[in-house]
Amino acid sequence: MRIMVAMSGGVDSSVVAARLVAEGHEVVGATLQLYDSRESARKGACCAGRDIHDARRVADRLGIPHYVIDAETRFRQSVIETFADAYAGGETPVPCVACNQGVKFTDLLGIARDLGAEAMATGHYVRRIEGPDGAELHRPVDEGRDQSWFLFATTRQQLEFLRFPLGDMPDKAAVRAEAERFGLSVAAKPDSQDLCFVPDGSYARVVEALRPEMAGEGEIVDGSGRVVGRHDGVTRFTVGQSRRLGDAAMRDGARQMVVGIDPASRRVVIGPRTGSAVRDLSLRDMNWLIDPPEGDLRCLVQIRAREAARPATVRRTADGASVTLDEAAMPAPGQACVLYDGSRVLGGGFIRRREMAGAAA
C-alpha cells in the first residue's frame, strides 16, 4: 500500500514511517512548513526549521522520498488569526483542533491523494478501529497521551483514509525504544511543548501583537457589576481560572474564580465556584462520528483537554447540540466538548459563550 506519513520531525511520526517501511509499504514522507525559516528555530515548536531537517534525516535513513509543504500562509490565516479572533471574542480557543482539521486533515490529506496515496498515517495517540458501520475513533491504550479530544472534528470520510499506528503503544518509552531499534536520530528528541506558535508560553503576548486593541488594563467585577479589582489584560484570563485575581481572589470567605470575560469593556467577571458552575451547555460547529441521534443521547463528555469525562445528556439541535451535565461544571467558551461512549469518540462541538451578569460597563 502507498501511504503518506505526516512527519513532524519528532520521534512519534518518525517511528510510524519506519514501521510502515518495515512492513513493506511504499512510504512517502511529508512535512508542513508553518513558519518563516528565519523565525522557526524556536525551542519547543513543531514543524519548525530544525524539525524539517530532522524529518528529512529520518526519511534519508529510511530511503523514502520526503516533501516539504509550504503551509505558512494557510496556517496563519486558518489557525493563528482565528485563535486571536476567538480571544478577542471572549473565548478560550483550541487552535490544535483547527490545525488538525484544516491544515493537516484537509490540505495535507488532499496532497496525499494527489500523490496517489491510499492512506495517510500520523503519529497521533488515538486508535482507529473498524466497526460495523465503518472506521471509529477511539482513545489510545496509553491514555496519558490521549489526543482524541483534539481530533473530534475529524470527519468520517477523513477517518476512512487516516491511520494511527501508535494507538496501541503502551507508553512513550516503548516508542522511543522502537526508534532506537530502527536507528533513528530522533529517538531521544524531546517532545514539543505548548502551542507551536507560542514560543514562550505567553498566549496573551501573541494575541495582543495581532490584536493591539486587546492590550491594556481593565476592571475585575463581581456578578452585580461592582468593581472589586483591576487586571493587566483580558487575554490573560479564561473561565474557571483563579490565578491573577490579586486582592479580589478571596471575597466573603470564598475563593473567587473567573466566570465571564467581556473583551469590549475589558471586564473580567468573578464569582465563587458555588453558584457559578452550570449544567447546561450549548455547542456549535458539531461534528458527528455517528449518525446524529434523534432523541436524547446518554454519554460521557469531556470539556477540557486534561479533565476526566463526565456523564451528560446530549440533544441534537438545529444549530448544534445542547448538553445537560449530571453535575455542574465551569466550561470555558471556545473549548471543545467531546462526546464519548467508553473509549469511542461519538462527536463533539465548541462551547458557545453565555452572556454574563456584570459584564457590561
From Swiss-Prot:
Record site: Interaction with tRNA: H124, Q335
Domain of life, source organism: Bacteria
GO cellular component: cytoplasm
Disulfide bonds: C99-C196
Subcellular location: Cytoplasm
Coiled-coil stretches: none
EC number annotated for this UniProt entry: 2.8.1.13
Binding site for ATP: A6, M7, S8, G9, G10, V11, D12, S13, L32, G123
GO biological process: tRNA wobble position uridine thiolation
Residues annotated as catalytic: C99 (nucleophile), C196 (cysteine persulfide intermediate)
PANTHER family: MITOCHONDRIAL TRNA-SPECIFIC 2-THIOURIDYLASE 1 (PTHR11933:SF5), TRNA 5-METHYLAMINOMETHYL-2-THIOURIDYLATE -METHYLTRANSFERASE (PTHR11933)
Protein name stated in the entry: tRNA-specific 2-thiouridylase MnmA
